[in-house]
Every structure is written in structure tokens, then in C-alpha cells.
Amino acid sequence: VLMGQTREATVLNSHERERVAYHESGHALAAALMPNADPLHKVSIIPRGMALGVTMTLPEEDMYLLQKSYLKDELVKMLGGRVAEDIIFGEVSSGAADDLARATDMARKMVREWGMSERVGPMAWRSQEQVFLGEDMGRGRDYSDDMANLIDEEIESILREAEKRCQTLLIENREGLDAIAQSLLVKETLDSNEVHELLGISKAPQEGLEDLTSAEP
């Protein structure tokens, strides 16, 4: 089962259930509106596996090369839950831990492995896992402290930019965010057609969103 096994024993109080609904609505709205991200398939607040809710996205076709525009929109989508919680409730929760881990890993790869940082430039360094498995086990880090600091700064910059774009997206579409969340509280699960109907759009993202995807990290 793609969405995992339903965890029927989990009973959330009304406040937590509303928070989960807005968290998943943030992901779903970003998936529906970011033109380069994987499109929305389904969103649910039924606890499954280790998750209290889930937003499923599916690529329209197999992807073997990841473009920078795609990665940047995916980061916005990943941060959608955390940003939605902050906008609605005025603070974030621990529920975004996995989202943050995945977003940080993606931003790190963009800078360290894929040459997608203008400041760091067209350079690549293997991950620690690759070093440990390879012949350079005792070699250690192969770049300077200054470069290490620059890499950290660029990773943070990419994530901060994604967070800012996500805040702009959700604030400008606050009515849609509320509509998705309230519908989830009633129906618990929505497919992509239902979400797009709540947002008043077709499956293709609205025109005018290009400015949200054009800023460089």
C-alpha cells in the first residue's frame, strides 16, 4: 500500500488534528501550485505508519535528471507543512522533523554534489557515506575550513529562500489553505481533483506563479 497501513489506535485531540490538517494542507497547496514540483496525488490526515498525515505526490513521468528549478520547487513543497503551522498557529511543532531532514539533505546535495550554488561554483565533494565505503577512508575532508563555512552558508541560504517563497505562496493563497484544511477535517482524505477544485484552478498551476520560482538561492 503506497500510503502505508492505517494506524487506527492513534487518537489526536482536536487541536492536534487541526494542526495536522493545516500541516498537510501546506504541502498539498504547494504541490498543487508550484509548477516544477511533482504534482499532487492525494492528501490525508488519517494516521498511517509513523506519520500522522500524508501528502502524496507522483511524477508525471520517470525522471533521471534533476533540474535546479525542480529541486527548488520541491523544497518549497517540503517546507509547506512547517510554514503552514507557523502562519496559522504562530509557532512550529516537531511534526516537520522528517520534512526538514529531507529538505536539508536535498539542499546539501545541491551545493556539495550537483554544483548548483553560484558562490561555491562548479565543484563537487563526495558524501561521507561514499568516503567511508571507498578507498579514501582515512583521507578526511578534502576542502578548507573557509569552504566548509561557505557550503554551510549556501545550504542555509537555499533553505531560507525556499522558506520565504513558501511563506509568500501560502499567505497569498490563505483562503485556499483554509479551504483545504477545513475539508480535510471533514473528509479526512482528498484527491488532487478535489484540492484543485477548492483552489479554483485546473490541474495546471496558475499563471503568475513564475515570480515565485525565478529567484536564485
Predicted regions and their residues:
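Soluble catalytic regions of large protease machineries
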Residues: 11, 15-22, 28-217
